[in-house]
Structure formats: C-alpha cells, structure tokens
C-alpha cells in the first residue's frame, strides 16, 4: 500500500508546508501559478486558467456552445 508523496498518511491532508494532493492545478504538491492553462478551449469557448490558490480548474465565465 503506497502513500501519496503529498499526503500526510495520518490525516490524509497535504503535508505541512505543501498546498495540495491532486487536481488539474496541483503539481508536485503545490498549486500551479495563476494564469496556467488547465483546460484548453473547445469550439467557441475560451481556455480555463488556474487561480494559483486552489487545486481545481475554475470555469471561466464565458460559456460557449460546447458547455
């Protein structure tokens, strides 16, 4: 049974000093820089970007026909 390198095995939370365990805006236990593309545009939509403060990929406000 292997433990995720970013996870405190007792609490199953990010280890002290680290930001995240997984997600499209998490790499090597840290949030990706704000403005990093986390989802490329499809159709007439626009790219989604990491916020720099969460491991999730926030949806942009513009919704194309594909959304």
Swiss-Prot record:
Single GO MF annotation: toxin activity
* Signal peptide annotation: none
Q: Which UniProt keywords apply?
A: Cell adhesion, Cell adhesion impairing toxin, Disulfide bond, Secreted, Toxin
Disulfide connectivity? 6-29, 20-26, 25-50, 38-57
The UniProt entry, under SMART domains, shows: DISIN
A Gene Ontology biological process in which this protein takes part is: cell adhesion
GO cellular component term of the entry, any = extracellular region
Residue ranges of the motif Cell attachment site:
42-44
Under the heading InterPro entries, the entry gives: Disintegrin_CS (IPR018358), Disintegrin_dom (IPR001762), Disintegrin_dom_sf (IPR036436)
Q: Where in the cell is it found?
A: Secreted
Q: Where are the transmembrane segments?
A: none
Give a Pfam family name. Disintegrin
Q: In which tissues is it expressed?
A: Expressed by the venom gland.
Q: Where in the numbering of this chain does the Disintegrin domain appear?
A: 1-65
Query: PROSITE patterns annotated for this entry?
Result: DISINTEGRIN_1, DISINTEGRIN_2
One further remark on this entry is: Negative results: does not inhibit alpha-V/beta-3 (ITGAV/ITGB3) integrin.
- Could you describe the subunit structure of this protein? Heterodimer with EC3B; disulfide-linked.
Q: Relate the protein's function as given in its record.
A: Inhibits adhesion of cells expressing alpha-4/beta-1 (ITGA4/ITGB1) and alpha-4/beta-7 (ITGA4/ITGB7) integrins to the natural ligands vascular cell adhesion molecule 1 (VCAM-1) and mucosal addressin cell adhesion molecule 1 (MADCAM-1). It is also a weaker inhibitor of alpha-5/beta-1 (ITGA5/ITGB1) and alpha-2b/beta-3 (ITGA2B/ITGB3) integrins. The inhibitory activity of EC3 towards alpha-4 integrins is associated with the MLD sequence of EC3B subunit. The ability of EC3 to inhibit ITGA5/ITGB1 resides in both subunits A and B.
Family as reported in the entry's similarity comment:
Belongs to the venom metalloproteinase (M12B) family. P-II subfamily. P-IIe sub-subfamily.
Protein name, UniProt field: Disintegrin EC3A
């Amino acid at each position: 049974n292997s433990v995720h390198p970013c996870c405190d095995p007792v609490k199953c939370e990010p280890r002290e000093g680290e930001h995240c365990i997984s997600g499209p805006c998490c790499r090597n236990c840290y949030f990706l820089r704000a403005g990093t593309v986390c989802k490329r545009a499809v159709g007439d939509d626009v790219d989604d970007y990491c916020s720099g403060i969460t491991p999730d990929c926030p949806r942009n406000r513009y919704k194309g026909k594909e959304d």
